Amino acid sequence: MRLAVQLAELTGASTSTAATQGPMSFPQRHPLCGPGASATYDYVLGLEAPAAQVSLTGPALSTLLARDTAKIGFGGIAPGVSRPGRGRGRGDAPGGRVIEVDAEASLPVLIEEVRRQMTSDRQRAIQDRAGKHAIANQQARLEALNKALEQKRAGWNATPIATARIYAELWPLIMNEDWILASPSGFSGGHNGQLWDHDKPYSYLGSQGAGGMGYGAPASVGAALAAKSRGQIAINIQCDGDLNYAPGVLWTATHHQLPILTVMHNNRAWHQELMFVEYMCGVRGRGGDRGHIGTTLRDPFIDYRMMAATYGMAGEGPITDPAKLGAALKRGVASVKRGQPYLIDVITQPR
């Protein structure tokens, strides 16, 4: 990340990032990151990203991309193959030449060459361009944030609790910590992308390949294992159905006293499947009265606080009153900062 930022600042380049989609190499809130002051580019350089005018792509990734005839993206191994804004160059530029070199290892050479060719006139032009990009990006950032807040405010006091409120109330509690969002966020609304700042390579570890179930808790506990020795905390916004595949990792987190906060997105269903079944019932004219069979978790409801307690983990819930959410999150963050894992069971909106 340091070298990518250095190159961008040396050239005053407008940049984009995949920070809200998974591990990345450019901070989301950097002044040069965003739409910029102009969409007209002389040159588009991709660093381990396909389809720029010239992309520096490692041999292993390049081989995967060349073999990806079905455009499946290798379950997230090859970033940007089919994701909007990443599969093509900036300004939707057409694909260009791929140079098979390691991007990170090549950056010092590029930086050295930029410095060699730098003149005072070029430096003044770069400073002017960078300033214009920074102003435009700040304006775009504020507009996007205000729009997101307006949209999410609509369900602020809803019961069951809106997933946006979980992310919104959690952010002030962790924003000054060295945090990792270790769990996928797509099924819980992906609100981190709009409300949080992703400025480190590990800010968000991304999603599970192919939407696979049972990934969230084990992946988050694994991240917490690495985070412990680094003084970091891991955040796990945990889907309820997903946890039931491998709940034993809660014992692992407790046994090793891992710094992980698990907040249950407990909609009492495998809601992706429930919505699909209800949709198909409508398409086939069968009625939706039996759509819950095999897709919901009721009769009985699962008490995840008690589940965590069985594995020795502290926790609380189920929380149904949104007014009580903030205090619970505060207790959870405090516990994790002491090195003790914590689980908060929150009864949530479906998505």
What spans do the regions from the language model cover?
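General beta-strand structural signal in soluble alpha/beta enzymes
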Residues: 15-18, 46-47, 99-101, 180-185, ...
